[in-house]
Amino acid sequence: MIAVLRINHRPFRDKRITTHVALTARAFGASSILVDEKDETLEQTINKVVENFGGNFFIKSGVDWKREFRNFKGIRVHLTMYGRPLEDVVKEIRESKKDVMILVGSEKVPFEAYEIADYNVSVTNQPISEVSALAIFLDRFYDGEELNWRFTGKINVYPSERGKKVKIIPDEQGCLDLLYKYGASDYLINHVKSVKELAVAIAKKTNADINLVTAGALLHDIGRTQVQGITHAVVGADILRREGIDDRVVSIVEKHIGAGIQSEEAVKLGLPPDNYVPETIEEMIVAHADNLFAGDKRLKLQQVVDNYRKKGLEDAAERIAKLHKFLSTVIGQDMDEI
């Protein structure tokens, strides 16, 4: 865990630069930032970024910086142009495996900060922006790995050679608005809400992304507003693509039928040739939560398996049973007990 400690913040003068310090801390792998002067506007700005773009970053202003720095149980780093070269100490700090607090000053830093710090670290001994210094330190600390981390938020930016490619993971109300836009019935709404409740309960027992599971569960049957057959998953995925919904949610919707449909079987069923077997934990959770409901009525695994076998779908019944067993193992509890 890395925390950033911003001191000597002057709300009416430093708001923009401290905002950038916080944004850099979040984007480059820190888990929180503490600011000495109380600044509610700054807190609101950063919290809004976290809400929209994801992550678990935390901000708190109005802290006693000396107490926070002195009492920190880990390695205390002070970034300063007068310190030891970054390249001489970063490996030692990283390999300690301890939590790190990085002090980043605004105006002149009190000498007491130098005395409390375990490491006074210099990114360069030339004048440099504290934003740049923090970014370089974090990048060296994580050895560039932080650039490969992916945040999951309402707004997700995808790389593109030109222009802007942004896709959305809607919150619960956004999902319901989308369903109503396409004319979802009360029956359908009640069904997806029931599936969502179970899916989220399962997800909380795993490392699954709750936002993806919530959106995928609520939108999994949006295709049923247009068609009622097995193609509703593909139709629903197409609707979401047109609506600019995140690809990971689209994939959950596209792969939620039973415990999945393999490409050879898909062609026989009249679906576009593709593999519709759930692969991510989020896809598996939503698919099986849907299996365990008929409308808003909860079913046990045996009821689901028996229903499939009565229709002559022995292979599908077996896949559902295997998925049930797998997820039960993951959460350490029989899915029927949730």
From Swiss-Prot:
Domain HD stretches: 188-295
Main location as per UniProt: cytoplasm
Q: How does it assemble?
A: Homodimer.
Which protein family is named in the record? Belongs to the aTrm56 family.
Gene Ontology cellular component annotations, sorted alphabetically: cytoplasm
Question: By what name is this protein known?
Answer: tRNA (cytidine(56)-2'-O)-methyltransferase
Q: What does this protein do?
A: Specifically catalyzes the AdoMet-dependent 2'-O-ribose methylation of cytidine at position 56 in tRNAs.
The record lists the catalysed reaction(s) as: cytidine(56) in tRNA + S-adenosyl-L-methionine = 2'-O-methylcytidine(56) in tRNA + S-adenosyl-L-homocysteine + H(+)
**Superkingdom of the organism of origin:** Archaea
InterPro entries to which the protein is assigned, alphabetical = Alpha/beta_knot_MTases (IPR029028), HD/PDEase_dom (IPR003607), HD_domain (IPR006674), HDIG_dom (IPR006675), tRNA_m1G_MTases_N (IPR029026), tRNA_mtfrase_aTrm56 (IPR002845)
